[in-house]
Amino acid sequence: MKNKTVNIIGAGLAGTEAAYQLAKRNIKVKLFEVKRITKNPVQVLDGFAELVCSNSLRSNELTNAVGTLKEEMRLLDSLIIRAAEYAQVPAGGSLAVDRVLFSEYITKEISSNENIEVIDLEVENINPNELTLIASGPLTTNKLQEQITKLIGNDDFYFYDAVAPIIEKESINMEIAYQKNRYDKGETSDYINCPMSKEEYLNFYKELINAEISIGHLPGEAELKYFEGCMPVEAMAKRGVDTLLFGPMKPRGLNKPDGTRNHAVVQLRQDDANDRLYNIVGFQTNLKWPEQKRIFSMIPGLENAKFVRYGVMHKNNFINSPKVLNKYLQLKTNENIFFAGQITGVEGYVESCVSGLITAINIANFINGKEMQVPSSKSVSGALLNYINKASITNFQPMKANWGIVDEIEFKRPNRKVTKQEIKKMKNEKISELAIDSIKDFIKNI
């Protein structure tokens, strides 16, 4: 049996999930977090597991890969999923949270755990002889980044993503905007929709692509590497005049109450438990703040919008996981060092959490002399870990949960006449069922 103390660097989603999982297995944890000493440009709260991009953990539906992933994590006793359900706010078929309540719940659970020692400190040195889980996230400090570079022998791991603005609900003009979920999913209408005619859209588009961008703190636009899942809306727009119509401004399933179709729709999603703040869905941005006020006020219904937070751009880091980590997210060159979270190349809140969860289970097995295990790729959890272990070394790109990375299944079409959409739904239901069964088998063996 090895030393039953683990250093965890970073009290974000992956780090807190891992700390909880190790502590419940009676393993002592030293959890290092720097934010109470100095915050990065997008952090606001003092608590752990702060959500700095969207407040949504995305779909809860089992026919969706990330919905199935959440169910897998429930079966694995995920602290993060429990916190999200505690802090949940209405969001149709999605799991969205009040950021403050969510962080407070996790901070309390971690801080009160007798097996976890929280240390407010910027880690400047990593002891290669101590068991360490690096879960420093996509905003790793420069000093820690230098240490990681020494460990992996490579400093080519960076990208940028962006944060969407938040506005006050009472400043939204509900004579123009209307409440509706896409295709009327869910029991309540949780999204506020701002419709646009073709003329309004083209005027908005023209201003957006010509707006001033805040680049003073960036090394040059040519060097930017954006996450597809959190791309600035202005960068997306520059791909073509219709690009936004198939992205954050997609009008399908969002007709006006009288049935009239829109050329484009901007959606707003509840951001707090008190239903006072709404974020502009998919509108992560790096525009200068006066430009955000000017251009986003062109959106019908937001002409008098009061912005409580403007969008900002921030640097994120990830490593070349297929090159430097084994399938247990353990450093190939040092068995004492593990990684988890977005720094490994999983993209998304829930994905980060599950990497911390599974890695913690394997660290516990490693300490206790048991065989380390990874869930089958029939599960979403296993498929994610399999992806970051076996993806291209020369062009590794972060990945969200999706059915495309899960093992293919044999699916027989029903004899009766069904639509393509019905077939897709039935197939996804079957994949989800097998994924959940796979996790149940994994649990039996750990």
Curated annotation (Swiss-Prot):
Cofactor(s) needed by this chain: FAD
GO CC entries: cytosol
GO molecular function: flavin adenine dinucleotide binding; tRNA (uracil(54)-C5)-methyltransferase activity, 5,10-methylenetetrahydrofolate-dependent
Catalytic activity: uridine(54) in tRNA + (6R)-5,10-methylene-5,6,7,8-tetrahydrofolate + NADH + H(+) = 5-methyluridine(54) in tRNA + (6S)-5,6,7,8-tetrahydrofolate + NAD(+); uridine(54) in tRNA + (6R)-5,10-methylene-5,6,7,8-tetrahydrofolate + NADPH + H(+) = 5-methyluridine(54) in tRNA + (6S)-5,6,7,8-tetrahydrofolate + NADP(+)
E.C. number(s) listed in UniProt: 2.1.1.74
Keywords from the UniProt entry: Cytoplasm, FAD, Flavoprotein, Methyltransferase, NAD, NADP, Transferase, tRNA processing
Gene Ontology BP annotations: tRNA methylation; tRNA wobble uridine modification
Binding residues annotated for FAD, in chain numbering: 10-15
Biological role: Catalyzes the folate-dependent formation of 5-methyl-uridine at position 54 (M-5-U54) in all tRNAs.
Record protein name field: Methylenetetrahydrofolate--tRNA-(uracil-5-)-methyltransferase TrmFO 2
Species per Swiss-Prot/TrEMBL record: Mesoplasma florum (strain ATCC 33453 / NBRC 100688 / NCTC 11704 / L1) (Acholeplasma florum)
Lineage of the organism: Bacteria, Bacillati, Mycoplasmatota, Mollicutes, Entomoplasmatales
